[in-house]
Amino acid sequence: MASLLLGTPSMACHSVSFSFSHSQSVAGVSLSSPPTLSLSSSVSTSPALPLIYCGRGDRKTAKGKRFNHSFGNARPKNKNKGRGPPKAPIFPKGDPSQKED
């Protein structure tokens, strides 16, 4: 408590203020733009990672597919889904070392 009275900062304080702006209309008809929200913060923050990630590390872009050697297969497939009925194996007829004349 004594540190608060003396004015020495004991811990970092973050202050955030919100302000809302909305004009009222006459007879239920709105004459202005939609409500706006403004946010001001006294704390400086480092820029966050972008929400849209593109480039070599993005497997959903052409450059990212080439970089990761995925050859266009960005999303894993369920091997049991959409394959149709199983096919019977095909065996070669006869012995390949014998030739028919």
Swiss-Prot record:
GO terms for molecular function: rRNA binding. It is found in: Plastid, Chloroplast. Keywords: Chloroplast, Plastid, Ribonucleoprotein, Ribosomal protein, RNA-binding, rRNA-binding, Transit peptide. It holds the Pfam family RPS31. The keyword Cytoplasm does not apply. Residues 27-47, 59-101 are annotated as: Disordered. InterPro entries: Ribosomal_bTHX/bTHXc/bTHXm, Ribosomal_bTHXc/bTHXc_plant. GO terms for cellular component: chloroplast; plastid; ribonucleoprotein complex; ribosome. GO terms for biological process: plastid translation. Coiled coil: none annotated. Residues 1-54 form a transit peptide. Belongs to the bacterial ribosomal protein bTHX family. Component of the chloroplast small ribosomal subunit (SSU). Mature 70S chloroplast ribosomes of higher plants consist of a small (30S) and a large (50S) subunit. The 30S small subunit contains 1 molecule of ribosomal RNA (16S rRNA) and 24 different proteins. The 50S large subunit contains 3 rRNA molecules (23S, 5S and 4.5S rRNA) and 33 different proteins. PANTHER family: 30S RIBOSOMAL PROTEIN S31, CHLOROPLASTIC, SMALL RIBOSOMAL SUBUNIT PROTEIN BTHXC. Component of the chloroplast ribosome (chloro-ribosome), a dedicated translation machinery responsible for the synthesis of chloroplast genome-encoded proteins, including proteins of the transcription and translation machinery and components of the photosynthetic apparatus. This is Small ribosomal subunit protein bTHXc.
